[in-house]
Each structure stands twice: as C-alpha cells, then as structure tokens.
C-alpha cells in the first residue's frame, strides 16, 4: 500500500494572512494544522500549538490577533515524501521524527499524512495486536488543577510539548484543556482586553474558565482497538485512562497508539 491511498487533502493558507483568519479556517475545516504557502508554493506548517505560543508571547500582548501574521507561527516540522512511498516507510518516519508527512510531486502538494490518517488505517486494517489494551499505550499524565492560571497551563504544555492537559479537582478528573482551547482563549482575550491591561488581566484567567467538561475516558483494560474506534468516532486526539477507582493513571494520544504498530 502507498501513501497516496490514505493521504488527505490539506487545507492551505498564505503566509501573509493573519492568525485570526487562520483560526477561523481551522474551525471551519475542523483541523489543528494548515499548510502555509508563499504565492502558492509550500512554505511551512501552521499548528494550533504554535498559535497558542505566539498569542501568549508577552512582547505581542499589545497586538490583536488580526495584526499578527501567519508567518510568525509557521514551522518547518514536516518531511516531504513521494506519493508512491510505502505505508510502512511512512509510518516509520512518523514514529521516528514525530512530524507530519507532506506528499509532493513535481514541486506540487498532493496531500498530507497526519496521525489521524494513520489511526484510520489502523482501524480499517486491524494493525494492532488483539492483546493490546489501554494500559499498553498510555503515557504518564501531566496534569493541572482547575484553579490554575491559563498562563501556567500554556507554559507547561509548551515546555512538555503536549497538546492536551487533564484538569483535576480534589484529585479527580473534571476536564481537559487542549492547545485549541488555549489558542482560542488567548485570541478572545486579546480582542476583549486592551493592550495596556492585558499583562495584569491575563493572570485572572483560570483553567476552569476554558476547560471542556464531560471528558470521555477509558479504563486500563479497554482493548486498544476499542480506544481507536472511540477516538475516531468522537473525533478526539487523546483519551484519559482511569483505574477502577476512577483515578487518572494515564493518557493515550494518537501518537502513543501509532508507537504500538509493529511490522
């Protein structure tokens, strides 16, 4: 099987466009990434994480998101591959380099392969051994409390390079904050609060104000194939793992599932 059989059409944005329009485009197409172009040519990748990074930068506090250009948050965290690249080679690349794959031919972008495409492949081709369960793919969770400041969560997520943060109250899971939640919260904050007051007012914004409640979770012995089905059905990028006492013991992401594939 070749990558052109599973790749998806990427959504693009010009590097001269604004962060505000990028967020609108991401919301419209339900994506956390955009391909950035320069006069139609591949320039880089814009991610929700880097938008959250830029919107929370103190030196840019006085600027509304409509004045910050896409190019300030663009990265080169991708690898170009040909459409006839073997799927096994592509998955190995993604596991080793922790990047997305851009499918190109004759200098033109044909599509991309993200962890979401690999998850769909795992589901359709039964690529996971039957004996694997949630406990095998979960990672130790990095958490925050609902009363913690949003700026603290942003710093923690960027330092640890994670896209989602389980939120606890009295030791129990009550919510989740994603890089998307951070980006939209920072965007709204900039539009509402004047530049001169942002440095002070941002400290009053806490995670309880922006977190998503009603978190979907699994238990440690849930078959990993069921976790994949759940993530695809609910269109979520991570799932907290609870023990039989309803205590948080881990978190599963798309990439932690991909790491379980063996050929």
Predicted regions and their residues:
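Tandem CBS (Bateman) regulatory domains
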Residues: 1-9, 47-78, 91, 95, ...
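A glycine-centered beta-loop-beta connector
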Residues: 26, 34-49, 94, 102-117, ...
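Hydrophobic, helix-prone linear segments
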Residues: 1-49, 53
């Amino acid at each position: 099987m070749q990558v052109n059989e599973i790749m998806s059409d990427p959504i693009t944005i010009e590097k001269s466009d604004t962060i505000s329009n990028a967020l609108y485009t991401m919301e419209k197409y339900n994506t956390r990434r955009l391909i950035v172009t320069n006069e139609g040519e591949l320039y880089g990748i814009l991610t929700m994480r880097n938008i959250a990074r830029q919107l929370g930068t103190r030196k840019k506090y006085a600027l509304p998101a409509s004045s910050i250009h896409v190019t300030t948050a663009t990265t080169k965290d991708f690898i170009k591959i040909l459409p006839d690249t073997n799927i096994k080679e592509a998955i190995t690349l993604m596991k080793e380099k922790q990047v997305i794959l851009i499918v190109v031919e004759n200098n033109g972008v044909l599509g991309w392969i993200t962890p979401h495409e690999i998850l769909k492949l795992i589901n359709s081709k039964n690529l996971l051994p039957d004996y694997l369960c949630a406990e095998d793919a979960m990672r130790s969770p990095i958490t925050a409390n609902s009363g913690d400041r949003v700026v603290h969560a942003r710093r923690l997520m960027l330092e640890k390079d994670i896209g989602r943060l389980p939120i606890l109250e009295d030791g129990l899971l009550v919510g989740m904050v994603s890089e998307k939640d951070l980006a939209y919260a920072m965007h709204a904050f900039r539009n509402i609060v004047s530049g001169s007051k942002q440095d002070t007012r941002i400290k009053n914004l806490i995670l309880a104000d922006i977190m998503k409640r009603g978190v979907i979770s699994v238990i440690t012995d849930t078959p990993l194939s069921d976790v994949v089905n759940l993530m695809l059905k609910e269109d979520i990028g991570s799932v907290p793992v609870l023990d039989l006492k309803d205590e948080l013991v881990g978190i599963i992401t798309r990439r932690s599932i991909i790491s379980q594939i063996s050929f």
